[in-house]
Amino acid sequence: MLVTMELPDWVGIKTERGFMTGPFRPDGDYGREILLETENSENRTDIFLTAGEEAVEWLIFRWKQSFSRDSRFLGDAWERGYGEMEWRCLNANRAMPWYFMAWNPDALLCYGVMTNPSAMCFWEADAEGMTLYMDVRCGGAGVRLRGRRLHAASVIARKYADCSAFEGAKAFCAEMCPSPIFPDGPVYGGNNWYYAYGKSSHDEFLRDTDYLVTLTKGCRNPPYMVLDDGWQVLADNPDAPPEGGGGPWYAGNRLFPDMAKLAGEVAARGARPGIWIRPLKDDVSPFSPEWRLPHTNCLDPSHPEALKHIVSNIQTVCAWGYRLVKYDFVTFDLFGKWGFEMTPSVAAKGWHFYDRSMTSAEVVKRLYQAIYETAEPFQAMLIGCNAIGHLGAGYFHINRVGDDISGKEWERTRKMGVNSLAFRLCQHNTFYHADADCVGITGAIPWELNRQWADVVARTGTPLFVSIDRAVLNEGQQRELAAILEVASEQKRHAYPLDWMNNTCPCEWRDGEEILRYRWHTPVYPGFVRPIEWEVKQLPGG
């Protein structure tokens, strides 16, 4: 049901000259040529900022509000989850990006901003009220609107009773996102990263494709086979920058001599070709310094010519024949921070984008929209990775909702994968399709653990990608994986977590009438990060 959002009780405005604070003014006039207006409709409150020459950094709205003492709170994350998502008690110091939910035995209260705002927004809740912070900076400096009226955000509130917390959360996500885009069919298949880790070749990738096609034989929908990092020009060059992972992206290297031919051969084998790209990173091409961000040296999409170059690379890989494009590092390369480092500011001080008239959120949206408009004529599916989901909803079909899993350390898969799947599953089929990352099958992790991970992903109806060393699985394990891939190929299941209120790594899930119990913490394999390197061996008689 709708919850009427009253006008805020208190307003704060931070500019480069100082901080203004006081009671909310219905006329919106706060001096210094700053106009902060609200427009209320039946189901939302729109917030608009108009400013002259004053460089505005933050807008802060404060409401008086009380929450029952037994309430539990859940917020979102800036980009991917890092294993930290959970329902918690009231914590006034907890920044909750984009939205938050307050659950008690009687109802679920939800407050948030609609997707695609023009500010980086987060909430705080405390014993006396709730506060919405809207970061309207341009990078780490104030935005210079020069008379432009900025639609900063649209705030909505809902209350859900007579349903589970998960059902209410999913309904609220649907309310926040009026215009999502979804894949035109089930997306599942293979990705070569978590066993190859960038060491592959044209022929090796085709052998991976053949293996995947064999595992998915008889599936109604063909799988995608995604070529991850390692194909680009500098990936096989000893003179490349030491951190790697960057462009240029106009061609493959000597191990991938013909990228268009490779895409065609993957398709001829019965799989749909996909590819990974890091579109903002190219340390070696002689671009104008204006094209580059001062703190990361990556391309600045607020510069029109830099943006044209960025999307030209997207067009190139689509023209080669790749029908799924996974574009990565698009938050780190812009802001120089991982999501867990944004505590709570997305951008550090001391820099700004080329176009000072745009907020950071507007720059991010411009990038996502340009990539979408470039890929759309090719009917290519887009996966955003290290992307800001609340800004990308409607611009990419799939979002990587958690940090990387591992083909070597089970603890990383358990922490990043299971947690992100459980706590962002409410965004699946509401914002986009939620991708909790791959299943890394290298032999370093017991099959029983990876089997469970693959099983729960398939049963949720979210995209399942497997990354397989072809020499690892025996015939029985291959049959088990083939059965799981068949479930993933249809995406008719919609399992969801049951014990997520009390467990950051939910073990109990409901799939229709079936209650599933997964054993993520098993004595077969240490459930912790090893503090030193040692070899895990089976003890005699164990």
What is each residue range found by the language model?
Residues 162, 198-206, 253-256, 361, ...:
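Generic detection of long, well-ordered alpha-helical segments
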Residues 135-137, 146-153, 191, 357-542:
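Active-site-proximal substrate-binding groove within the catalytic cores of carbohydrate-active enzymes
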Residues 1-224, 324:
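Carbohydrate-recognition beta-sandwich/jelly-roll modules
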Residues 49-53, 99-107, 209-216, 263-267, ...:
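Hydrophobic, Leu/Ile/Phe/Ala-enriched alpha-helical segments that form helix-helix packing faces
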Residues 43, 184, 221, 268-270, ...:
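Short, well-ordered loop/turn elements at secondary-structure boundaries
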Residues 88, 99, 221-443, 449, ...:
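Aromatic- and carboxylate-enriched substrate-binding clefts and catalytic-loop regions
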Residues 186, 245, 455:
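Residues that flank catalytic or metal-binding motifs in active/ligand-binding sites
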